[in-house]
A protein has these predicted regions:
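Helical hairpin unit composed of two closely spaced alpha helices linked by a short loop
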Residues: 374-375, 384-404
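Active-site metal-binding loops of divalent metal-dependent hydrolases
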Residues: 280, 383-384
């Protein structure tokens, strides 16, 4: 490592500490505001103590209704049980919290906005019945899962797409940088966490160069995921160099009915022809530039060909959903180009995304279906293993069948 690299790393470390401190301050301030709101609610309840018997009766009746609603819902048991216990043990607190954040469906205005964008975007996805039939004929089990994805998430299956798998995140980053430098029309990037440090600076330099060449660059990130990594002036800094930024569900100092919904997508789209996705965010620890949790193991994939269209639609859906209509795209067709790429590989590719506006757990259902249909082996690679009871049961059952 050269002296200059050491100085840059030291500078990134100091800046990282400052950003973490800034994020902690934001969290603390927001926590204090939420506590004050909670204290106000408790004070109001105390003031209404003279109506305690009536309030208590109504709360218990409502608690019973909510417990029955939860029991009949299609949520997983790991999602139901904490709410059921909280509501039964602490009815007033449990009912209040559930009505505030447990419904997890967003506001009516937000739902209408998502629905409107989906009505405009989803019809632009191809509907290749021949491709579906070919998959179903060649691999019936995969065909069934593919049909489920298309029916419940609206994303189709493709051919004519080449895939490269990266067993380390840093390899994916290197390939990503090389492809970003070749962008001619647009670059879309959507990530749960962005850290304004070494890894991002490598990307930012390429993005700034592409902006000067007339390329439209959009960056989208989750506020909670990035809260300890970037300062509040990050968007202003990016806009000053021509990089357009938007934030998903900003963390505000107050109770928020949509707070529990976070954007965990990791997507890069280049000219609608090349796409990257996988498990890594754009933060130093994912590429082992820093080691706060030891050696980090994550993966990524590169797509080139027709299947990139679904990644483009996924990005445009969320980008337009979080902003006012007058700032949104009036025409999506300019980003959904027809590719003349001829793939070397002959497999089937189906990128898909889940929606925060419904209760269908598409991602989990796909994994459970894959495990249930496995005959020889079922291998997963993830730095996180936080699974539901249903997923755990599926894995155990597969192991009992002799699946590795």
């Amino acid at each position: 490592m050269t002296e200059g690299e050491r100085k840059n790393m030291k500078q990134d470390t100091l800046e990282g500490r400052a950003k973490t401190k800034n994020g902690v301050k934001r969290l603390c301030f927001s926590a204090v505001c939420i506590l004050l709101e909670a204290a106000f609610i408790i004070a109001m309840i105390t003031k209404l103590n003279q109506y305690a018997e009536i309030i208590n009766l109504m709360t218990r009746l409502l608690a019973g209704v909510l417990v029955l609603k939860l029991y009949a819902s299609d949520q997983t048991s790991s999602m139901k049980m904490p709410w059921v216990i909280l509501i039964l043990v602490f009815p007033i607190l449990g009912v209040g919290l559930y009505l505030l954040i447990g419904l997890n469906g967003g506001t009516r205005k937000m739902r209408e906005r998502y629905d409107q964008i989906d009505r405009e975007l989803l019809p632009l996805l191809p509907n290749d019945s021949e491709c579906r039939e070919t998959l179903g004929r060649k691999i019936p089990k995969a065909g069934n899962i593919s049909d489920y994805i298309q029916k419940n998430a609206s994303y189709p299956v493709y051919q004519n797409t080449d895939v490269i798998y990266y067993d380390e995140a840093v390899k994916g980053l290197e390939a990503q940088l090389a492809d970003l430098a070749k962008a001619e029309k647009f670059i879309f990037m959507e990530y749960h966490a962005i850290e304004d440090a070494q890894a991002w600076h490598k990307i930012q330099r390429v993005l700034e160069d592409r902006v000067k060449a007339g390329v439209e660059v959009r960056v989208f990130y989750d506020d909670m995921g990035s809260i300890g990594f970037i300062n509040t002036d990050f968007i202003k800094k990016m806009e000053n160099v021509g990089i357009h930024c938007r934030v998903f569900n900003p963390f505000t100092p107050g109770l928020n009915v949509f707070l529990n919904n976070r954007d965990h997508r990791k997507i890069t789209v280049i000219d609608g022809k090349v796409g990257f996705t996988g498990g890594y965010n754009l933060a130093n620890e994912y590429f082992n530039f820093t080691h706060p949790y030891g050696q980090w193991k994550d993966t990524g994939i590169r797509l080139e060909g027709e299947a990139v269209r679904s990644l483009t639609v996924t990005f445009l859906e969320m980008w337009n959903a979080v902003s006012d209509k007058d700032k949104n795209d009036s025409d999506f067709t300019g980003f959904l180009v027809q590719t003349d790429y001829q793939a070397k590989q002959t497999g089937f590719i189906q990128p898909y995304a889940d929606s925060p506006m419904d209760h269908e757990q598409v991602g989990e259902e796909v994994y459970i279906s894959m495990v249930n249909k496995a005959e020889k082996y079922c291998w997963f690679m993830t730095p996180y293993l936080i699974i539901t009871d249903e997923m755990s049961h599926a894995l155990c059952l597969a192991a009992k069948r002799g699946v590795d």
